[in-house]
Amino acid sequence: MTRRFFIILLLFSYFFTLSCAGVENLKASLPIKVACVGNSITYGSGLANRETESYPARLQEMLGNDYDVRNFGRPGATLLRKGHRPYIQQKEYANAKAFAADIVVIHLGINDTDPRNWPNYRDEFISDYRALIDTFRMINPKCRVLIARLTPITILHPRFESGTRDWHDEINEVE
């Protein structure tokens, strides 16, 4: 129930952001290509049918045929280049770049709260994020990049303990 609520909330926030992002200018070149870049949350891990229940699939359903929404999620991916599984070293990253999207939705950072990552590389988070955004803008200078806030975490998830919750809040405060 809680997971489904957060997915619906996430979809609503994406849809609202997209509708306010000036995509009317993009409609001249239909379909508008949307790349959903992220980790297991984007990928749809844990869902009964990720092909229809992941947020990129739901976003495609909401936006309709004028959009081509693709899922470039990689479970365990980190934004940090020196993280334990950097997104930029995954095939999904190469595929997302090749897609040359008009809109890129980035939902990365939750795995960066891992004790192997955040304590050691937190100072590189913003520069690594900017580098990722710049890469997509070099491929398509007119693309719009939307950054999703981190999915809320709870004490019920065994991985998110003690300092990890604090690091999660630090990442969410980055602007």
Predicted segment positions?
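Positively charged n-region of N-terminal signal peptides that target proteins for export
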Residues: 1-4
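Bacterial N-terminal signal peptides
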Residues: 7-17
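Bacterial Sec-dependent signal peptides at the C-terminal "C-region" and cleavage site
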Residues: 16-29
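A generic local structural motif
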Residues: 22-23, 89-93, 132-133
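Short, conserved loop/helix-junction motifs that constitute active-site signature segments
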Residues: 27-29, 99, 138-140
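Conserved SGNH/GDSL esterase-like catalytic core that processes O-acyl groups on lipids
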Residues: 30-35, 41-127, 156, 165, ...
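Alpha-helical structural signal in soluble globular domains
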Residues: 58-62, 131, 135, 139, ...
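Active-site segments of SGNH/GDSL-like serine hydrolases
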Residues: 107-113, 133-169
